[in-house]
């Protein structure tokens, strides 16, 4: 029996449709492989740090502490703290173990800035900012932890928070935050200040509102001529702005660091995927982390969309009214170093409010 023309056309259409479907599936597969290859290549640029990274001996840590005798805060109107009131191993932090298990709809990523030049070893953490993603409320909180807070550093003598990172890296800093403040950290990201400048330049600078005193402080010792008001700061200027301290206080310094971080987020939110790609190529090589590739991908898929609509909040620990700052005299004729003595329980309460997902 002869096939009708209609049957022939139908057969050709089926073959054509099948070919088109196969081509589409092949393109989808090719695109998937290409995306996987690109993402894997990007993540391969990151420096992954073993959680059991090298730690300093207690003797080496003591040597680092004595270096602060020459680099203490020079402010003259601060009181000398009574050495008797300096926290001991028993009083520096609450005695009950701190909960460190995951907190459900809360994800805590710790951003650590260290003042280290290329080729140098691990230094003290100059900036410690906890980024808290609350998936229930859609809120992203930036909480700065003051580097001069006098804390219990597990395995070492009590000293300032910024020494924890130099003594034992990310893992010891995380443990220190858990013991003193009850903060569970899900992952860490470390950026050197030298790389921080490059990142800002890649994004074309950040927009910041300056006071005249801040502008004068940035201009000092440079050919720059910044004025008060809204300014676009390139990498070197933004870094100098972030590190202004003696103009007012370390408290304001931490606030400036968060200002720059939020300005960076605003810049990133305005970029297209095409604009983002060459920047990612550079940025990935600037950071180190203790998170795995799979963890980074999972968190990026889950949390990155929050950037476009999240409400941002800012906090500082210790919070006003819960600490006393002053110089500690440890040798005759020397002031010693500057530190904050803290009401830990009051600050734990504030942190519990930040982590509250209800």
Tell what function each PLM region has.
Residues 2-13, 31-358:
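Non-catalytic, solvent-exposed segments at the cell envelope interface
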Residues 9-25:
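N-terminal Sec-pathway targeting helices
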Residues 23-33:
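Single-pass alpha-helical transmembrane signal-anchor segments
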